[in-house]
Amino acid sequence: ALIHDWFLSESFGGAEKVTQILDEYISKNFSEPDIFSLTENITNSRNNIFNRRKINTSFIQKLPFGKSNVQKYLPFIPFAIEQFDLRKYDLILSSSHIAAKGILSSPDQLHISYVHTPMRYAWDQMNTYIDHSNFKKYGLEIPLRYLLFKLREWDYISGSRPDYLIANSKFTSRRIKKYWGLESDIIHPPV
């Protein structure tokens, strides 16, 4: 199984390209992996990296604006990623900048996670995220801070779920060590 946080045409960047390369490599050398993502909204052919294959999505896909603005459902992302049933797979590869590394696997499965960053919203960019949200304007800064505190806890716990962590850079490896207390190997992205 291959899992990535989400696929959106308007925010198609390096993490998505890495996932595409992983898919191409696995498909060429083994068989096409089943693909999972919280949401998918690939609307143009340039970004249709999976040749119109089915992408298994979470319940967030069906919520209003879930396909196009998954961040609106930030409080539900940990729950949503944990709902994927991946029991039939021996190998799980996750490409994660928020949640994909948090999928639930069994001791009989190998989970390798290529980490682009620990959850920025919850760690060093928390105050920037708060400043750019409308929560302050509506007097909801304290509830937002509490939510981010809970997301930080989940990010810390879920960081230890993969059997093997790969960081995309020395900087990301340092962030993994600082925020999760874990070691990671570094493999620079081929993009």
Regions inferred by a protein language model and the residue ranges of each:
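Active-site donor-binding segments of glycosyltransferases and PAPS-dependent sulfotransferases
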Residues: 25, 29-101
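Nucleotide-activated donor-dependent transferases that construct or modify glycoconjugates
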Residues: 1-12, 39
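Phosphate- and divalent-cation-binding pockets in alpha/beta enzyme and binding domains
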Residues: 102, 174-178, 186
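Active-site proximal beta-strand in glycosyltransferases
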Residues: 91-94, 105-136, 185
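Short amphipathic alpha-helix
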Residues: 15-26
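Membrane-proximal helix-turn-helix segments that form the acceptor-binding/catalytic region
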Residues: 133-165, 173
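Short beta-strand scaffold positions
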Residues: 94, 166-167
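Carbohydrate-associated surface elements
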Residues: 171, 190
